[in-house]
Regions:
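Extracytoplasmic small-molecule ligand-binding "clamshell" domains
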Residues: 23-103, 108, 169, 242, ...
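Periplasmic-binding protein-like
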Residues: 46, 119-130, 192-237, 255-268
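Hydrophobic residues within well-ordered alpha-helices
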Residues: 69, 92-93, 139, 179-181, ...
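Short helix-initiation/N-cap motifs at beta->coil->alpha
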Residues: 78-90, 134, 168-182, 215
Length: 268
């Protein structure tokens, strides 16, 4: 991941180890097995985390939210790093991870249960200098090539809406940007969170104001872990009600990420 995106992610991070509530003195029976294990393994994929080039440690809003959850549990945090969402989903399926952060995803629905929303990130487009494209409708024309990350939720949503434009796939956000930079694509599709810092790398590039959907991030627990899900939902609602997530985002001037509304009000 490019250094500018790493800097952005690190700027929005919550204070290291910041708890949302006091760590458990007596283990909650719903998560007693996690407490006994002494750690919670949270699977993240790019760009949910970034690596400090000096220390090699993962950082970012998702990392710090996971750290706050582990602090509430009173256990250590183990970040399990992946390059793509399918890799993270496989991690949960094989019990190599305990939790993920994902939008509602049919690929994970049979192996995991989803919490209330915690983050919201709009889906939109990045266009290079001189482009006449000002909306998704403008981009959906014959001959237009839209670079997108394969199997990403933003890509899946866009593919359902496109009628004429062609998707050109890459495996990571950085590779997708390279397709646009080298003229192998006319537009790049992703989340506003990813596209805004990328636009800084392309003089004159624009991130469109409109959106074609949103990534409503939720925490995901393995199927059959109803106690975990109830506990996670309490954590999520405490985080939103306290303003902790949104205040951290605002304090750092983060672009493209907001705290989700209270409850499960997105309807997704």
């Amino acid at each position: 991941m490019k250094r500018s995106l790493w800097i952005l992610l690190m700027m929005v991070a919550l204070p290291v180890g910041a708890p949302i509530a006091n760590a458990q003195k007596v283990p909650d029976s719903r998560v007693a097995d996690l407490v006994r294990a002494g750690k919670v393994r949270v699977g993240l994929f790019l760009p949910q985390y970034s690596k400090d080039p000096a220390t090699g440690l993962a950082g970012g809003v998702w990392v710090e939210s996971a750290r706050a959850f582990s602090s509430r549990l009173g256990v250590q945090l183990a970040i399990v790093e992946h390059s793509t969402p399918p890799e993270a989903i496989a991690c949960l399926k094989t019990s190599a991870c305990d939790l993920l952060f994902l939008p509602l995803d049919a690929r994970a629905a049979d192996i995991g249960d989803f919490s209330n929303p915690i983050f919201q990130i709009d889906y939109t487009l990045l266009v290079p200098v001189g482009s006449s494209i000002n909306s998704v409708a403008d981009a959906d024309q014959s001959g237009v090539r839209i670079a997108a990350v394969r199997n990403h939720a933003s890509t899946n949503e866009l593919s359902r809406q496109l009628k004429r434009a062609k998707l050109v796939y890459a495996e990571t956000p950085d590779q997708t940007l390279d397709l646009l930079r080298t003229g192998q694509a006319d537009v790049m599709a992703s989340t506003r969170f990813v596209l805004l810092p990328f636009s800084d790398q392309l003089p004159g590039a624009r991130v469109l104001e409109g959106r074609y959907g949103a990534n409503i991030n939720r925490m995901v627990v393995p199927k059959g872990k109803g106690g975990w899900l109830a506990y996670v939902n309490e954590f999520v609602e405490d985080a939103k009600a306290s303003g902790l997530v949104q205040k951290a985002i605002e304090r750092a001037g983060t672009r493209g990420v907001t705290a989700a509304p209270p409850g499960n009000s997105t309807g997704q």
